[in-house]
């Protein structure tokens, strides 16, 4: 962002990390970047915890990701695309009444479970019956109570098991 114009360089602050893109969120590291000395002086006034809560491993992993991680990033993106398509195809084959779509630039599928008649909280029902956990749709608004969020940034084995557990719990 800071490179798009002189105005962006003068007033912009970029907050970023390698966490999501390179799938290293558990390593706790982020960056706050400015190209303006006055903004840097204001950023320097932030509480010390802001500067020192990153892990040393996260800092090294982030540096490696940004410097040499293009191949890794492309591999992660390819894997996520494969997992997304696999989830979509498994749902179509095993749970055709579950509505979903192929997400873009995400690793989360939004599943409409309303046709399964799982009660007021489908996520809780599936946790109890199938021992599979999802983010409950109601957390995203009253209109989403029959939805669950499925994070597919995991192995195909785990994704297949999760969908099989839904099928077995019905």
Residues covered by each model-derived region:
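Short, flexible turn/loop "capping" segments at secondary-structure junctions
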Residues: 23-24, 101-103, 141-144
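Helix N-cap motif at beta-to-alpha junctions
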Residues: 36, 115-116, 155-157
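Conserved core segment of the aminotransferase class I/II
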Residues: 5-81
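Short amphipathic alpha-helical segments
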Residues: 27-28, 105-107, 146-148
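PLP-dependent enzyme catalytic core of the Aspartate aminotransferase-like
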Residues: 8, 121, 125-134, 140-170
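Conserved glycine-rich beta-strand-loop-beta hairpin in the small C-terminal domain of fold type I
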Residues: 63, 79-88, 99-113
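Short hydrophobic/aromatic beta-strand micro-patches
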Residues: 33, 110-112, 151-153
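A short linear hydrophobic-aromatic micro-motif
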Residues: 88, 97-100, 133-138
């Amino acid at each position: 962002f800071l490179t798009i114009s002189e105005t962006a360089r003068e007033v912009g602050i970029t907050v970023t990390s390698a966490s999501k893109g390179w799938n290293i969120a558990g390593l706790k590291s982020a960056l706050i970047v400015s190209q303006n000395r006055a903004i840097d002086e204001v950023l320097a006034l932030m509480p010390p915890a802001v500067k020192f809560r990153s892990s040393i491993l996260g800092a090294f992993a982030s540096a490696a990701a940004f410097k040499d991680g293009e191949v890794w990033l492309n591999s992660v993106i390819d894997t996520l695309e494969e997992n997304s398509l696999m989830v979509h195809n498994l749902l179509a084959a095993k749970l055709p009444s579950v509505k979903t779509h192929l997400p873009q630039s995400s690793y989360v599928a939004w599943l409409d479970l309303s046709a399964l008649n799982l009660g007021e909280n489908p996520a809780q029902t599936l946790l109890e019956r199938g021992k599979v956990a999802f983010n409950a749709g109601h957390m995203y608004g009253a209109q989403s109570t029959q939805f669950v969020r499925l994070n597919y940034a995991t192995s195909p084995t785990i994704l297949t098991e999760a969908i099989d557990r839904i099928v077995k719990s019905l």
